[in-house]
Amino acid sequence: EVIAPASLDMDIRLVSVIDDSVGADALLTRGGETSLQELKGKRIGVGMDTVSHIFLMLLAQEEGCSLDDYELVDFSSPSNGATALVTGEIDALATFEPFITSCMNADDSISIVADTSAYPTMINDSIVFSGNILDTRFDDVVKVMECFYQAVDYWKENPDEANEMLGKYLDCSGEEFAETMTKLNMLSAEEAYAQMTAEGDDSWTASMSAMSSFLLERGRISQDIAPSDYVDTSVLAAITEN
């Protein structure tokens, strides 16, 4: 969702990775299948060109499958996709929390085929600003990100109170929100900066480069794009130096 607009030459800057998905994204099924191979010919719900779609494509690559072997049903609304799985309109669903938990709570026959706990650096959430805003209001962007990391620190230090407050925004209880957050590794500013500036074949930058090539090969973007074209670590550098 960052690489695609960047590949269209949109002036966006990814200023921080904020978490790694360690189970917050998954492929669910109604039929007890334990692999994507076993779902061949079935109807799979997914938001096309979303993170869930990318997860499904990567999973297909891991298992040596082609998504042409499945009937993909596009759901722009994740809640509609969850409803379709629970009611049996589709056989499987690529989705994310809190919809994973809500589906499994609604029907105990629904189970996880695969999730990102097995691929901890595959899916990240990040914060992106327009290049113009970053260039003209850098200090304000730093303040926004400082506030964000203060909120993360508050959540870590006051989990019970924070989970209750945040759960209200997702129409779930504090306990349900807490369960959802066990599937995300929330990064501090220092951890995010270290992850985004690390080098090597197993680094975050290498993963982003590989993701761009993967999307290009599958026709999801029209040109390959390097992380250096859209990643800007200057905000995190300013925060971590203070």
Task: Place the predicted regions along the sequence by residue.
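Conserved C-terminal helix/tail region of periplasmic/extracytoplasmic solute-binding proteins
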Residues: 208-242
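Short phosphate-engaging motifs
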Residues: 1, 23, 35, 52, ...
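Short, glycine-/small- and polar/acidic-enriched structural segments
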Residues: 1-66, 72-77, 91-97, 113, ...
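Pocket-lining segment of extracytoplasmic ligand-binding domains
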Residues: 73, 79-170
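Phosphate-coordinating loops and pocket residues in cytosolic domains that bind phosphorylated ligands
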Residues: 41, 105, 232
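Secondary-structure end/capping motifs
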Residues: 135-220
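Helix N-cap/coil-helix junction residues
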Residues: 10, 33, 65-67, 172, ...
